Design a protein with these regions (language model features):
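Carbohydrate-binding surfaces of carbohydrate-active enzymes
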Residues: 14-18, 22-154
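A Trp-anchored, charged/polar loop motif used as the substrate-binding/catalytic surface
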Residues: 2-4, 134-135
Length: 154
């Protein structure tokens, strides 16, 4: 599922599914809304998906940097990727998954943000913030996430 759509009774649909999940693509840094307003709206959506089943939900897709389809599609400012991921977990998610891991070589999503860009560099900000910095935060709370220290170092 993705955001709110009129005509869909999410709680009725929740009775038919095993796990609630959604794709989260907030429009950070848009001129008509503060970062705080975007965060509050996103928090409400996380709470909606948690409450659908009364248990943790899966965040199936989120962008580590920007999208290729929103009216305003700016690179996330430093710290926003971490804020967004930690907010997701704080509101009951069992996962924070990114679309896409590696930038597409062609087609419609070639210019959609990715953890690893077209140049494959590990020193790019989306890679550092979504894998290394965020992993450091998660490693404090989730022992199973310690695998990330093998990639980013201690």
């Amino acid at each position: 599922m993705m955001y709110r759509f009129d005509g869909i009774d999410y709680f009725k649909m929740a009775k038919e599914i095993d796990v609630a999940s959604w794709d989260n693509y907030p429009t950070w840094h848009k001129p008509t809304e503060t970062v705080e307003e975007t965060a509050l709206d996103t928090a409400m959506m996380h709470d909606l998906y948690y409450s659908m089943k009364g248990k943790p939900f899966l965040l199936m897709e989120s962008s580590p940097s920007f999208t290729n389809w929103q009216p305003v599609s700016k690179q996330k400012k430093p710290g926003i990727a971490e804020l967004s991921a930690l907010q997701t977990v704080a509101h009951g998610a069992d996962s924070v998954l990114y679309f896409q891991w590696r930038a597409s070589r062609g087609a419609e999503e070639k210019l959609h943000g990715a953890v690893i860009g077209h140049d494959g560099r590990e020193d790019a900000r989306p890679f550092r913030e979504t894998l290394c910095k965020l992993a450091d935060s998660m490693n404090r709370w989730v022992f199973a996430a310690r695998w990330s220290s093998l990639v980013c170092g201690p």
